Amino acid sequence: MTKNNLFAMLAIACAAVLCSCNQQKGETITLQVKTQYGILEGLEEDGVKKFLGVPFAQAPVGELRWKAPQPVQAWEGVREAKQFGDDPMQLDVFGDMAFRGSGRSEDCLYLNIWTTAATTADALPVLIYFNGGGLMAGSGSEPRYDGSSIAKEGVIGVTANYREGVFGFFAHPDLTAASDYKGSGNYGFLDQVAAIKWVKENIAAFGGDPNKITIVGESAGSFSVSLLMCSPLSKNLIAGAMLSSGAEVLPYQPSSQADADATGAELLKQAGIASLTDAMALNADPLQKLLPPRGMANVVLDGYFMTESADAVFEKNEQAQVPLLAGWNSLEAHPMQAIQGQAPTLQNYKNALKAQFGDMTDEIFKAYGIETDEDVMNQKGFDLVSDLFTGFPTWKVCDYHAKSGLPVYRYHYMHPRPQQSEKMGDKVAALAGGVREKTAEEKKAQQPTIAPGAVHSADIEYAMGTLDTNEYYDWQDEDYAISKLFLTYYANFCKTGNPNGEGLPQWTAITKENLDAAPVMKIDVESKEVASPEKENAYRTLEKFYRSKK
């Protein structure tokens, strides 16, 4: 071999090494990121790159109202992504939810991205959070869902809006007949699918791994995630799922398309709207006032988003084959909500629920260990009404999933929010996380300033590391410590499908072998794992009741 040939081969080898290094290093992520639809320009704060108000579908306005989301159209030049898009149209159902969007509009299909990735080669895991609010309120712009803290843990945070209320969950015979898939009513859920697809197609440009997407939601968002785990449109797009207080399985039931259509037609009639054409012609605000939300919508078996109930999918083990982390709070509901102003005695509690439980009332109360007046207002009494609201269906998804041989990590969040700050004034916390003015009766009553447990939605700021965004409470060191633990569990789960990590309380997965005494992480000042055969028996007893009514 000549010297020139040797030098030539060395040069080729060096070039190959440099090329390999560049490929491993990946492209540097700046504040301008090229997506499949155009260039976005974000901003950076405290070491986190933010891309806000990113369109993931066409605006569902005009002829696109009450249609499945359509692919976003490409744009030319650089599109600024420095402020949140409009929040979904909604009435103030739950009080002030502290939105950061510029207003409320049907043009609301935007997502937000928080990343600390330096290059595209970082391939960070991704967390997509779907907000709660009964499918009729809430937004991805709410500060409590902010992705900055999870981004600092090495996970790309994403929030995504979806249509709510009448705009997201209205079915009608004419809409069904006109759609390509001969269905209607699941528009908000289809928006969530579109958001996941957009992230999967584009997140690599932000330093994310499209094959490591975990979805999470609280309350209505959690119900949504349980459905997204089952929908043929989304179940193969995700690598993990987290449920926080809710799932659309037993006792919640889907609607048939025919029933949903009939309900929609009757709603128009009751509102004095002569036809779907007339409804389409109404502006958004008068429309939502004429057709206000009536509680959380049932998913419709539209033959597209859902072809059968989530229970049926889980029973056949046809749900997403991914790790699951799920739980609920210790005070999702209060016995006084059932007793309705009467004395909190055992007999009054039984009387309040007898219309629901019938002949199984005594058996269910015994299973929950509610045997004295004192039990009504302690954790035993809290557990029963909390399970009737969100606890039982969340438990049932865990039960289904573990029986399928898939890893399940279950928690029970126990820690109450601290003393309210002076900012709360004459306001009171609302159900879904907002605040509202106290009623005249509430102003007269001596209400405790610290709840006896973790109320519905109280976990969000802790789990997402966003305590400081909520100025209505006087957060203490123990709150920040719990938040750090919860956030780390979330981040670890997104990274590995397992929440455990060095220095954390050990969290054992539920398996087919330990179902009768399932391990549960009690998240509190002193977090620890417990197993209670008695509690599992209580859930089985409640399941027996629900199945007897099907």
What spans do the regions from the language model cover?
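Bacterial Sec-dependent N-terminal signal peptides
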Residues: M1-I29
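Non-catalytic accessory segments of hydrolases
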Residues: S20-N186, P210, Q476-F486, T496-Q506, ...
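Substrate-access "cap/lid" subdomains that shape
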Residues: M97, A194-K197, E201, K235, ...
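Alpha/beta-hydrolase active-site loop
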Residues: C108, Y181-A204, D259-A262
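Active-site loop->helix "elbow" adjoining a glycine-rich segment at hydrolase catalytic centers
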Residues: G132, Y187, D191, S219-S222
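Alpha/beta-hydrolase fold nucleophile elbow
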Residues: F206-E218
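Short glycine-enriched nucleophile-adjacent loop
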Residues: S222-S234
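Mobile gating loops/cap/lid regions near enzyme active sites that modulate substrate access
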Residues: W395, D399-K550
